[in-house]
From Swiss-Prot:
Sequence segments annotated as region (Disordered): 122-142, 218-305
Modified residues (Phosphoserine): S5
Superkingdom of the source species: Eukaryota
Lineage: Eukaryota, Metazoa, Chordata, Craniata, Vertebrata
Pfam families (UniProt xref): CCDC50_N
PTMs per UniProt: Phosphorylated on tyrosine residues.
Key words of the record: Acetylation, Coiled coil, Cytoplasm, Phosphoprotein
Assembly notes: Interacts with RNF126.
The name this protein goes by in its record: Coiled-coil domain-containing protein 50
Length: 305
């Protein structure tokens, strides 16, 4: 086998070979560092996107729950208001019926009183027609006197006693009318007191229901706020964020050391990836409703008065 001869004059020097080897090694190291940086960048982007998607889902879920709670609360307020309106309308109808009944009763009483008065007048006229007029003692003679010798005739005594009986009957009728009116006033006052107590009871029930609704809504808001804070302060999320920050810091230091090296050719160009900034969403909760106290019952009551 023939020996291969090597021209020693064309061989490069040791320094040139070392320099070329150093350049090749630098290229290889730069390429590996760049690949590591790209992989780290992709991993951080994926993790960021996952966090953003998770935050979006949580925010959307909380917003839907808040909207549902508001809709339910508004529905309950409307139902309570409608119930108050129905109660007020019922009370107003009862007051109207009571006033109409009282008016009819008063009219009947007036008619009865008028009939009684006409009857009394007719009886008085009839008594006057049937009662003879006496002129002294000439009708019965001069000897028609009392046993005690008085001058008072018997016919005049009967004429005086008849108006006394009529006035006594009128007094009884007047007393009965006053007693009836007093009894009606007492019944009316009792009915008014019962109605006022019912209205006050309805107002108290409405106030208690409204207070319970406010407490329930406040508890729901506090529960949502605590769950959101717990998700924000989750230790697993903190550990993931710290590891991502340390990896990015190591990549930045390696890249800085690569740039600081002198007299090295630029690394091969690579396609860069654009960073996607995470979008933060804030969940704005609506404020609580101040429903005024339902005054429909009071309005109906005062309108009637």
């Amino acid at each position: 086998m023939a020996d291969v001869s090597v021209d020693q004059s064309k061989l490069p020097g040791v320094k040139e070979v070392c320099r070329d080897f150093a350049v090749l090694e630098d290229h290889t190291l730069a390429h590996s560092l760049q690949e590591q940086e790209i992989e780290h960048h992709l991993a951080s982007n994926i993790q960021r996107n996952r966090l953003v998607q998770h935050d979006l889902q949580v925010a959307k879920q909380l917003q839907e729950e808040d909207l549902k709670a508001q809709a339910q609360l508004q529905k309950r307020y409307k139902a309570l208001e409608q119930h108050d309106c129905e109660i007020a309308q019922e009370i107003q109808e009862k007051l109207t019926i009571e006033a109409e009944r009282r008016r009819i009763q008063e009219k009947k009483d007036e008619d009865i009183a008028r009939l009684l008065q006409e009857k009394e007048l007719q009886e008085e006229k009839r008594r006057k027609k049937h009662t003879p007029e006496f002129s002294g003692g000439s009708v019965f003679g001069d000897n028609y006197y009392h046993e005690d010798g008085g001058m008072k005739p018997r016919g005049i005594k009967e004429a005086v006693s008849t108006p006394a009986r009529a006035s006594h009957r009128d007094q009884e009728w007047y007393d009965a009318e006053i007693a009836r009116k007093l009894q009606e006033e007492e019944l009316l006052a009792t009915h008014v007191d019962m109605r006022a107590a019912q209205v006050a009871q309805d107002e108290e029930i409405a106030r208690l229901l409204m207070a319970e609704e406010k407490k329930a809504y406040k508890k729901a808001k506090e529960r949502e706020k605590s769950s959101l804070d717990k998700r924000k302060h989750d230790p697993e999320c903190k550990l993931k964020a710290k590891s991502a920050h340390s990896k990015s810091k190591e990549g930045d230091e390696a890249h800085r050391s690569k740039i600081d090296r002198p007299s090295r050719p630029p690394p091969p160009t690579m396609m860069g990836l654009e960073d996607t900034d995470p979008t933060h969403f804030t969940n704005q909760h609506s404020t609580t409703w101040h429903l005024p106290k339902s005054e429909s019952s009071q309005k109906g009551f005062h309108n009637k008065q």
